[in-house]
Amino acid sequence: MCGFLVNVPATGFTQAVWTEQGVPEHQELRAKVKAEGPKLLFSDSPEMVYETGILYRDTLQGEGRLFFHHVNGTSKLKKLAIIVKNNGLRPVNFTVTRSGIDGPSHDYQAVGKKSQEYYFEEQKSKNSTLGFGKTLELLGGEGMLLPTDQLLTGTIDFFSDRPVEVTVLMCDPKTDVELFSALAKQLPMDEHPLRGTFVKADLNYKLQHSIDTEAGAGYALLLADSQTGEYLRGTDATTGLPAENYGNYGVIYNIDYKLKGDKPYELWLNPWGGMFAGVGVLEQGGQRKIINIPESPAFGRLGEEGFCIARLEPNSEGRFTWSPPGASNLPIRLFWLPSDYEAPYLHD
């Protein structure tokens, strides 16, 4: 049984291991998927940065989102900075609508998880006006210091009423980031092609059919899997080459579901791809709840574990929102299971 009712403060949690019997018997759910939302700038290659330079750069207008994930791979202290620049003649109104940043730290999964917790929290917009040639640095105004082998990661949503150039860079601690951005060289990717610009970075899933709770069956939905064709495709703006977002990092998933019947169900998450540490948001009955997945630092070493997110009331509908966390593995599966489901090897 699940550790808490939706819309009621959590008093515990339930985690299960399914190694002997396998994951619960289930029917695969189908959903209609609509891609919309901001243009995504994805900066994760090189992940381990061994020299100073430009990590990613592109120009965009309108709704934007930046996901960055970089480790200082040098033996000396460095600085990571994000520069927004107006190269046009007319003033730009630039607004950061939402952000979640964490680090630096050696605990990469903890940083990825905490940055999502910050991102999903309620927050106020931050407005700026940039004149011709003016810049704005998004990590505290001057960049953030990054010690050796430590990670800094985050997601920043923004809106610009005119084109702006966005640059992610790493430089020495005392370097003028604005001048460096104008003169530094573009660094090549590492062996993992994880950078690019992608349109419509919100994926909205609507289950094609209501979940029939009277049948007492289990249901599952596979997400962020390389075989489903859902990984965003775009362009590496620094090279002009095609790009694919392996893992859909920086993509927001919204899953709308509806329960039909008088029996309560539970929503579970299975980290099928391996170790996972993230955050989700459950909305139901006018309430919004941020949930750590799992409550412990991470789980999923076996790929056959489950975390009970919430108990869902009969004849209810809701939305579950999540995003692939930096340093976690994919894909995942969501399970809708009867509330009297007895999970093996429970950890409370």
Where are these predicted regions, by residue range?
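Intrinsically disordered, low-complexity Pro/Gly/Ser/Thr-rich segments with frequent PxxP/GP/PP motifs
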Residues: V111-P147, G286-E317
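Short acidic, flexible loop segments centered on an aromatic residue
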Residues: L89-G112, E266-G278, L282
